A protein has these predicted regions:
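A generic structural signal for short
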Residues: 7-8, 36-37, 58-59, 114
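Conserved AMP-binding loop of ANL adenylate-forming enzymes
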Residues: 16-57
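Active-site glycine/GP-rich loop and adjacent strand/helix microenvironment
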Residues: 55-168
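Short glycine-enriched loops at secondary-structure junctions
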Residues: 9, 37-41, 87
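Conserved AMP-binding A3 loop
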Residues: 1-14
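Short secondary-structure capping/junction motifs at helix and strand boundaries
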Residues: 2-5, 27-35, 60-62, 138
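Short, composition-biased local secondary-structure segments
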Residues: 12-25, 39, 92-103
């Protein structure tokens, strides 16, 4: 049974603020185009999209569309940043290659934010995804039942930074 994640309006606002700050520390800027490719059901992804919007980035709610459709979205909207899981980032890159698309050359993704499973903080895994995509990979960590994204990696990639002002 999935975990329900009830949040107050204040919790949600704090979370959106934290996402915007964390995205900034990971290099996302207002001129970026961000695609969120995780579902919005009981995974609480809404604040991630709203955090990118608060920062000024164009935000695309891609959800869990088929991989071929997501690749088309990445090309059509010239997406520069994507949020997904580490395993799906790898799978999507491999799918692109099978479709004759070189993620490094043909897509223009510069940042991949990963969460939801181990991998993003494992240097070897992160480096393999970065090599496949030609993009920087940043790990995010969260617990749906306390605050969603509780920590994230900055451009130094030397660990995760806690949302200390929101986690008590």
């Amino acid at each position: 049974m999935p975990t329900a994640s009830p949040f107050s309006a204040t919790d949600f606002d704090d979370w959106i603020d934290y996402e915007a700050r964390q995205f900034w520390s990971s290099g996302l800027r207002p001129e970026d185009r961000y695609a969120h490719s995780l579902n919005f059901s009981l995974f609480v992804g809404g604040p991630c999209v709203l955090g990118a919007q608060k920062l000024g980035a164009l935000s695309i709610h891609a959800g869990t569309v088929p991989s071929e459709r997501l690749l088309a979205i990445l090309r059509q909207f010239k997406v520069t940043a994507i949020w997904t899981t580490p395993s799906y980032a790898w799978y999507l890159g491999e799918t692109a290659l099978k479709e004759g698309i070189d993620p490094r050359r043909d897509l223009g993704v510069q940042r991949i934010f990963v969460a939801g499973e181990p991998g993003g903080s494992i240097a070897e895994t992160r480096q393999r995804i970065e090599a496949l995509w030609g993009a920087d990979v940043y790990d995010y960590y969260g617990l749906s039942d306390i605050f969603g994204s509780c920590a994230g990696m900055c451009t130094e990639k030397d660990g995760l930074h806690w949302a200390e002002d929101h986690i008590h």
